[in-house]
């Protein structure tokens, strides 16, 4: 007797369930996507014990005909594709015909559905076996309940996380679906407690406000672009609103949420030097394209896709974001604490709001004005640095009570800010006063961010603090400028242009530089020797696993030649290519940082004025090359609020 045998359907479904149904979040995703494909406009999701005990999905979609109910739970049975041509023109979220049989094989499932034209169907399935089928009275739509998930595969239960974690995975998926389909009203309940409710009015800003808070929604920049192959729409936050994880970026392709690293990377590249290292924006990007240009049949979970014209798409995303930011003044507001109802702000935003303004005001730190009066439009030139206040030798220290108060906040600060998307709640669902209509009104009242160019307005210096921060003013209020970051931006753009224009000339090293590598690294570098020659770096083999460098391109910054060479080697080993543009940019950043004014360096008023005027000539006067903010703004209104001049 042969050893190879065909597996029965039940065992096949159990195996398939291992890929399709990884955890309760997978069940919710598949069932909600089925509801959307069935043209539902309202979907309710009810959970018990994070879905491990019970998941119930109720929709008002097309429903399932009686004759299709049994067939729907057979493997690879679907109404969404018919032939090979349909597979490459998929517009629906589901198409594989694996979800329902996979879910039914590892749970106790109950289905009540009706098309509205005939009596409904009531179906009970346990572990893949049909227990009961009968006609029943039912409204149009589908009501499907999944209980005791993985009851017959206890090994899978061992890999489930805590209820808190599993619930977080579900809310994360539901949030993405809500962003993907703002035209569908979604309600999410856990143990009868409402966690999310979207109106289904098609306004994605309202969905984003429900998820991230109304304060974040006020900082959203609309993104829109179109090419022959792609249409892009979405929102991204201003550079001042960032998170420590990429998890806050959502990419949607033809209505389907996908996890695609290169798309997220393109969004980051669109910000370029506007973001600090290790910080990421909150973003939502919806991409529409011909289904022929995207392959969604990569993985059973359908979260991964491949693009036919990937480079064109990435370039469009980067250029669209960069163009949008060039139309905006990116000066972050410092903000002033005001009494607002907690329902208006998330915990995260309350913390940011309270701690964004300076915490240690001290009278001696204020530098005297430099001769400006109300009638003058230009500041008086004061050349004598003696007029600037000099700090005492002993630096002022805040009272110990303030220090203790700050320290007591630190542990909770990290836990609040660093949490992933699913932990961020924008409003308390039990607050009866906060209704969906109020959120709609607040979103409608949000003013569009002004797209009136990103030129820095004229700033008139009024002093310097700690030899580090410059104070300036204009008719819009007070500005605080980090002098090192400001000159770093000026120098960066100068060196970037200078390095970018340098011809491929080489310069001899006085002492050859030796590079020792592992065998794998050596082989990868050896493959790229010709590419390295094209950018002006000539390597000679020296021994078994080493190279020596006798010359380098003339644009290498003096004193950092070996650092740039090591960076090039690291690029070759990791990326298997040489990105000369990135190398030159890093060289420009390195040179600009070393050549800039340092902290605790006192400047004359003329030097300050010249620095601010030079900053205005840069293409991006708002962040240094590392993404840190250069200046912060206090509006006149905020200052009046501080001093209770307005209430």
Swiss-Prot record:
UniProtKB keywords: DNA damage, DNA repair
One example GO MF annotation: mismatched DNA binding
Superkingdom of origin: Bacteria
GO aspect biological process, one term: mismatch repair
GO CC terms of this entry: mismatch repair complex
InterPro entries: DNA_mismatch_repair_CS, DNA_mismatch_repair_MutL, DNA_mismatch_S5_2-like, HATPase_C_sf, MutL/Mlh/PMS, MutL/Mlh/Pms-like, MutL_C, MutL_C_dimsub
SUPFAM superfamilies membership: ATPase domain of HSP90 chaperone/DNA topoisomerase II/histidine kinase, DNA mismatch repair protein MutL, Ribosomal protein S5 domain 2-like
Pfam family membership, one: HATPase_c_3
HAMAP family: DNA_mis_repair (MF_00149)
Function per UniProt: This protein is involved in the repair of mismatches in DNA. It is required for dam-dependent methyl-directed DNA mismatch repair. May act as a 'molecular matchmaker', a protein that promotes the formation of a stable complex between two or more DNA-binding proteins in an ATP-dependent manner without itself being part of a final effector complex.
PANTHER family membership: DNA MISMATCH REPAIR PROTEIN MLH, PMS, MUTL (PTHR10073), DNA MISMATCH REPAIR PROTEIN MLH1 (PTHR10073:SF12)
Family: Belongs to the DNA mismatch repair MutL/HexB family.
Protein's UniProt name: DNA mismatch repair protein MutL
Species, as recorded: Bacillus cereus (strain ATCC 10987 / NRS 248)
Underlying gene: mutL
């Amino acid at each position: 007797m042969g050893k190879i045998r065909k597996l029965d359907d039940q065992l096949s479904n159990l195996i398939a369930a291992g890929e399709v149904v990884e955890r309760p979040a997978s069940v919710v995703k598949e069932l909600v996507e089925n509801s959307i494909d069935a043209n539902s406009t309202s979907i309710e999701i009810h959970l018990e014990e994070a879905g491990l005990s019970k998941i119930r999905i109720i929709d008002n979609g097309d429903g399932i005909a009686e004759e299709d109910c049994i067939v729907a739970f057979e493997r690879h049975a679907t109404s969404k594709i018919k032939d090979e041509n349909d597979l490459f023109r998929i517009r629906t979220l589901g198409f594989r015909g694996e979800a329902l049989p996979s879910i039914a094989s590892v749970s106790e499932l109950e289905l009540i559905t009706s098309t509205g034209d005939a009596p409904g169907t009531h179906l009970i399935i346990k572990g893949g076996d049909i227990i009961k089928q009968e006609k029943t009275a039912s409204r149009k739509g589908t009501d499907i309940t999944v209980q005791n998930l993985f009851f017959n595969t206890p090994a899978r239960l061992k890999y489930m996380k805590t209820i808190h974690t599993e619930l977080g995975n579900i809310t994360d998926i539901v949030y993405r679906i809500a962003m993907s389909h703002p035209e569908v009203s979604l309600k999410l309940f856990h143990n009868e407690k409402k966690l999310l409710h979207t109106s289904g009015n098609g306004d994605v800003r309202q969905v984003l406000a429900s998820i991230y808070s109304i304060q974040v929604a006020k900082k959203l920049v609309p993104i829109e672009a179109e090419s022959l192959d792609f249409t892009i729409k979405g929102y991204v936050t201003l550079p001042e609103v960032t998170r420590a994880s990429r998890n806050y970026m959502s990419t949607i392709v033809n209505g389907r949420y996908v996890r695609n690293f290169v798309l997220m990377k393109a969004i980051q590249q669109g910000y370029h030097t506007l973001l600090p290292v290790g910080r990421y924006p909150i973003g939502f990007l919806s991409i529409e394209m011909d289904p022929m240009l995207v392959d969604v049949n990569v993985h059973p979970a359908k979260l991964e896709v491949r693009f036919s014209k990937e480079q064109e798409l990435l370039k469009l995303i980067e250029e669209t974001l960069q163009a949008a930011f060039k139309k905006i003044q990116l000066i972050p507001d410092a903000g002033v604490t005001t009494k607002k109802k907690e329902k208006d702000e998330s915990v995260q935003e309350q913390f940011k709001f309270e701690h964004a303004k300076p915490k240690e005001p001290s009278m001696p730190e204020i530098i005297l004005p430099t001769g400006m009066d109300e009638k003058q439009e230009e500041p008086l030139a004061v050349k004598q640095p003696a007029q600037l206040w000099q700090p005492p030798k002993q630096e002022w220290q805040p009272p110990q009570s303030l220090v203790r108060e700050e320290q007591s906040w630190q542990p909770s600060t990290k836990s609040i800010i660093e949490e992933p998307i699913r932990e961020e709640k924008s409003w308390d669902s039990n607050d009866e006063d906060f209704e969906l209509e109020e959120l709609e009104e607040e979103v409608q009242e949000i003013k569009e961010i002004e797209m009136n160019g990103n030129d820095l307005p004229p700033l008139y210096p009024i002093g310097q603090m700690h030899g580090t921060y410059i104070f300036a003013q204009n008719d819009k209020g007070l500005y605080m400028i980090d002098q090192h970051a400001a000159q770093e931006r000026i120098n960066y753009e100068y060196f970037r242009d200078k390095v970018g224009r340098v011809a491929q000339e080489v310069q001899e090293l006085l002492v050859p530089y030796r590079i020792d590598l592992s065998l794998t690294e050596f082989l990868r570098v050896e493959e790229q020797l010709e590419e390295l020659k094209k950018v002006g770096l000539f390597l000679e083999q020296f021994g078994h696993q080493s190279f020596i460098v006798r010359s380098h391109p003339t644009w290498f910054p003096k004193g950092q030649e070996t650092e740039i060479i090591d960076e090039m080697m690291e690029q070759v080993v990791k990326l298997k290519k040489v990105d000369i543009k990135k190398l030159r940019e890093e060289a420009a950043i390195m040179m600009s940082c070393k050549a800039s004014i340092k902290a605790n360096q006192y400047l004359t008023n003329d030097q300050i004025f010249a620095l601010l005027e030079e900053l205005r000539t840069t293409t991006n006067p708002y962040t240094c090359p590392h993404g840190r903010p250069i200046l912060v703004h206090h509006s006149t209104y905020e200052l009046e609020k501080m001093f209770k001049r307005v209430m």
